[in-house]
Amino acid sequence: VRENVYVNCNKYYTILIFITMLFEISDGKKCDIFVHIFNHLKHFTDSIVLTVSPEMLYIQGMDSGHICVYELMLQSDWFQKWEVDNKQTYGISVPILNKILRICSVNQTIIIHSDNDEDLQIDFTSEEKGVLNKYLKMPLMDIDTDHLHIPDTEYDVDIEMDSKKFKNLIDELSNFNETLNIDCDGEQLTFESSSGEGTMNVIITTDDVELLAVVEDKEIKASYGIKYISQMCQFYKLSSTCAIHITQDIPLQLKYVIDGDSIMRFYLAPKISND
């Protein structure tokens, strides 16, 4: 396996560090997206296994209640520099990584690299005059985890709509209940939230969204926890649109296409009726 050389210089000395993994994000918008992901991932988990390979950065995990699965795939060409020769895994504390990433200033490049099994090094650099370069290090965690196999599924309802619009809709529905009821009679799709304080019904038609496709004559009644959907919607900045896929009695899928084949998606288990 080829080892790459990372050089860190200043006027006093030069240090050559033989690294086993390095990736870099210099595009300002992509830096914001990367920071945004971990800022909101902390609401699902305290720790992750970050897997890097020559092809991509991959994260998969489940919330503590085993209700929601999250999955992130950032292809190698999404990064401005990607130097990974073989598959490697890193156990990461999400709160610590989020704390570090929030130190990154506007117009700084994010460089993440490692040369051992104990630490992950994160550099924030800039060629702009007056912007201080920052070099941080965080300890790695020993985490045992297996990736879930998520089979491809043909859904009965496919919706594509503005991400911010969907987030606002879920925020409004959450005012009335902790449960989102979805009803489809083959012709009309309804989102409902109801409690003793009132009921909110939203009828969704093809005129309201980018795409609405329903299997002909298919009737669906499904319920999901609004709190989880609301947390999933916090990632709306990843993409201008989101895709929602629904089939009765199987997990709802919410997907953001970040760029090309780089995506983030969630699978949310339906609530089980007591009837």
Model-inferred region functions:
Residues L16-K42, S47-N175, N181-D275:
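DNA polymerase sliding clamps and clamp-related checkpoint/processivity subunits
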